[in-house]
């Protein structure tokens, strides 16, 4: 008899029960790992699967996380074979070519489309009912690409979008007002990145509209220069990349925030990337961020935001820029 047999006597043969809320992270780069640790530390799933083409890096990261199993409640698995991801509830895609210093998110496109042609069919094969969350940049275009390649209905393909931009925005407004970001309600919509649209008309603290107090807020003529805050949001990622080489922690926490709303069926409203054709005067098949309700079935509803004419124009301009790139893509 082995030590194990001497120690433990079976009462019944265990039937394998699949995980109810398995999450997969595709890509073990900086963003993938920050997403993984954020998901683990928030205890969101009972199984976390990780997959990447870089076998040694993947093996090392998985092993490193598994060594912390005592401090976690999540089973951690990893393999370059996508069978490890089977029956995931949410699949987070962070894989792709990384943005170089000074490189625009749009420049990354075709490099990442080619990577997605391998990743997406594999995800669909093993988790045909999952909710796909795209994080790789440029996120709005790649969410469209994932939607096209997966054949999933639009409510099951979500881009992390401006969830992070809005968090950065709220943090900076909070800094200026000496308040916690959760008390500074503010939304950034449109494209994640350079042409994102700050909705100044909706910025409020405790229901008090800041534009009511300062009608010039967000315009060139504003003596307090609130507009600079949005510039800081846009420049924020480039600044971090310049200083440390990549961004990871905030996007990782942002991803975990979205995964939590889905897995816990919270019906929380997040600015995430979805098909906006027919909204805010957008005519083309593009994905942009608008406030959306997230729950167990994915993206169930869109909130109709009241945008000012110039804000709406900016959204349409983003849409045109993205469509200009999308129609050139070979899918």
UniProtKB/Swiss-Prot annotation:
**Keywords assigned:** Cytoplasm, NAD, Oxidoreductase
- Signal peptide residues are none
UniProt: NAD(+) binding residues: 29-57, 98, 137
Annotated GO biological process: lactate metabolic process
- EC numbers listed for it are 1.1.1.27
Which is one Pfam family of this protein?
Ldh_1_N
rRNA-binding among keywords: no
* Assembly and binders: Homotetramer.
Q: Which family does it belong to?
A: Belongs to the LDH/MDH superfamily. LDH family.
Question: What is the protein's name according to its record?
Answer: L-lactate dehydrogenase A chain
